[in-house]
Amino acid sequence: MINRILEAIIAGLLVAAVGVAFVAVIYRYALDSALSWSFELSLALLTYITFLGAYLALRKGAHLKVTLLVDRLPRPLRGVSFLFNQVLIAMLGWIMLWHGGRQVMRFADQTTTVLEISTAWYYAAIPVAGGLILLDAIWLMGVGAIRLLQGNEADPRPNQSGEI
């Protein structure tokens, strides 16, 4: 359910970014006029697409991984490896949340040149994605530990991809 909501949000942002770029090109080449706000808006949209997309890929298990050694481990050690991986992911989420939040506060009083919106809106994508990553990793640690104690694979995601 969460994946589908994220996919819809990201798709909407992508459609908006493509629409803004298309309109900017039409204005530039067909009407010989530039839209001064198109770059700033496209940049904001692409920032959110990037960070929300990274979180969605994490939820689906779609990030690049090398499993040559882990696949050869016995199930309990694979589970420990999974839990350790989630600890590292949680640490990354915390770093993004903490330092991204500091960046938001640092640039809150600065505005963009054309749209005159706070640049904090650009940076807010980092702590938002970091918080989501942190919560997801904590949830997967809990579920993974329970599954491991029950004698199952720790990773609850089917084939490490798809809906949770």
What is each stretch, according to the model?
Residues 1-164:
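Alpha-helical transmembrane segments and membrane-interface helix-loop junctions
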